[in-house]
Amino acid sequence: MIIMLDKIVAKTEERLIEAKKNKSLEELKDEVSKLEINKDFPFKEALKDPQIAIISEVKKASPSKGLIVEDFDYIEIAKEYEEAGASAISVLTEPYFFQGSNVYLKEIAEEVSIPILRKDFIIDEYMIWEAKLLGASAVLLIVSILDIVQLKKFLDLAHDLGLSAIVETHDGDEIRTATNVGAEIIGVNNRNLADFTVDIENTISLRRCVSDNIIFVSESGIKTKEDVAKLKENNVNAFLIGETLMKSDDKKSLILELKNG
């Protein structure tokens, strides 16, 4: 997985070169400057749901699982998530390994009213400006692919643009980095980067390392209402659920089951 992460980052660098040929950073900033910048941070507020805050993911494929679904009506999937009571939607925009697209995010943002997370491998401020233009309410910042200076810069930029940020971690060292840069939302990826195994106990053990005022998100490996209940009992605030929902034939019923037990 660590080698895969390097490959994804390398491909993201190639994507950025092409993106900047089509639209420079200055042109992108100019377009964003025409947007209204609200600082009400709807994504962060959505995760404060006192019941169960579910971030439902729109994901066609992944490096570990390959193609997850062939019938990929992303707009209908997003609408189904919203109707079921999802707190927010995560949209993969990485095209090579996850078969995501910026178009998916833009079009979903035009069709739903709940906040959207741009889930990608952000390594350049360009991608944060781009997320704002596409209609995202939040971005994912992955500690393991950024140095602390980049992480702080990107976190501050996101907030300046009215975007929330999930700062994604995998271990105690990364948790400390996230808290040191002032992350308000910390995510824990339960997938082991070395061997692909998934264990929600990772979230539970790391939750104890941060204060209760930090919004804590568990990512990967959440499959049942029992998983959700166990995490909730351990003061986890939100649950990012992708593959389990994408493979479900009745996404609405599954979300209702996860939310209501």
Question: Which residue stretches match the model-derived regions?
Answer:
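Active-site beta-loop-alpha junctions enriched in small/polar residues
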Residues: K11, K59-A61, E94, F121, ...
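Catalytic cores of alpha/beta
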Residues: I123-L134, G172-V181, S218, I222-I241
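C-terminal helical cap(s) of enzyme catalytic domains, especially alpha/beta-barrels
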Residues: S205-C209, K232, K247-G261
